[in-house]
Regions:
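Cap/lid segment of the alpha/beta-hydrolase catalytic domain
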Residues: 1-68
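Short glycine-/acidic-enriched loop or helix-start segments at secondary-structure transitions
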Residues: 10, 46, 89, 114-115
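Accessory cap/linker subdomain of secreted extracellular hydrolases
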Residues: 17-23, 29, 91-168
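Beta-sheet entry/capping signal
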Residues: 33-34, 75-78, 99-103
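Short, solvent-exposed turn/loop segments enriched in Gly/Ser/Thr/Pro and often Arg
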Residues: 38-43, 53, 81-86, 107-109
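Short, basic, helix/turn surface patches
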Residues: 59-68, 75, 108, 129-136
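Alpha/beta-hydrolase fold nucleophile elbow
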Residues: 71-84
Length: 168
């Protein structure tokens, strides 16, 4: 579960290259299913991207509940990922679900606060990487972009430096 699945074709017969091919080649032969799920505001999802926020957690929880209760499912869901995708398993575990049986988070964050803020001010890498890079994943030049643009993103670029300069 992450922001990297931008193939945009729900009927695709091949996986996104990120972890999908590895998972399909190594897990499917042993009876596991693989689903690649985009967080809000990325891929073909809509909504404002809520970087590791409550809305993102609710979306991840909804995906776990759906996959665990689907007719094709045996009721067991596991989540694996690295980098951003390595953070989403923790979000799923924090929400709690009878269907979530295991998580394999690799090189992810337990929370974004320490990455985004230092000494009461937003770090430049926080605004650039997360608001800029991840925030742009939901923007692809179509009419739905307005739904994916978060009103607080622009604030993130000036709030940290302004607080630092003003002492607030």
């Amino acid at each position: 579960i992450g922001p990297y699945y931008d193939d945009g074709d729900v009927d695709a017969l091949t996986p996104a290259d990120r972890l999908g091919r590895f998972l399909i080649e190594n897990f499917v032969p042993h009876g596991y299913g693989v689903a690649q799920v985009s967080v809000f505001g990325t891929g073909e999802s809509n909504h404002c991207m809520d970087l590791m926020g409550l809305d993102e957690q609710r979306g991840i929880h909804a995906a776990v509940e759906y996959l665990g209760s689907a007719p094709f499912s045996n009721g067991g869901v596991g989540i694996i990922g690295k980098s951003y995708d390595g953070s989403t398993p923790w979000e799923a575990a924090a929400m709690g679900s009878e269907y979530l049986k295991t998580i394999i988070p690799m090189s992810g964050l337990i929370g974004a606060h320490d990455l985004m803020w230092r000494n009461g001010s937003m770090e430049a890498r926080g605004a650039i990487m997360h608001n800029g890079v991840y925030g742009s994943f939901g923007l692809d030049g179509d009419l739905e972009d307005a739904e994916n643009a978060c009103e607080g993103y622009l604030e993130g670029y000036y709030a940290g430096p302004a607080a630092y300069l003003s002492g607030d």
